Amino acid sequence: MRVKINLKCSSCDSINYLTSKNSKTHPDKIEVLKYCPKERKVTLHLESK
């Protein structure tokens, strides 16, 4: 089952991206390096619901 998740910047706590994942095949939380427009640099984004 695919669920919608938000990706939140780890340094400034702004929610920048919306994505989905399959919770059966990937039960752990997602950690992705993405661009943060507020900080204007690439930062670590963590899964939040």
Curated annotation (Swiss-Prot):
Ranges that cross the membrane: none
Keywords in alphabetical order: Ribonucleoprotein, Ribosomal protein
UniProt KW Transferase keyword: no
Designated name of the protein: Large ribosomal subunit protein bL33A
UniProt record, GO biological process: translation
Cysteine disulfide links: none
GO cellular component, one term: ribonucleoprotein complex
Family (UniProt): Belongs to the bacterial ribosomal protein bL33 family.
Organism: Streptococcus pneumoniae (strain ATCC BAA-255 / R6)
Annotated GO MF terms: structural constituent of ribosome
HAMAP family with a match to the protein in the record: Ribosomal_bL33 (MF_00294)
Keyword Ribonucleoprotein: yes
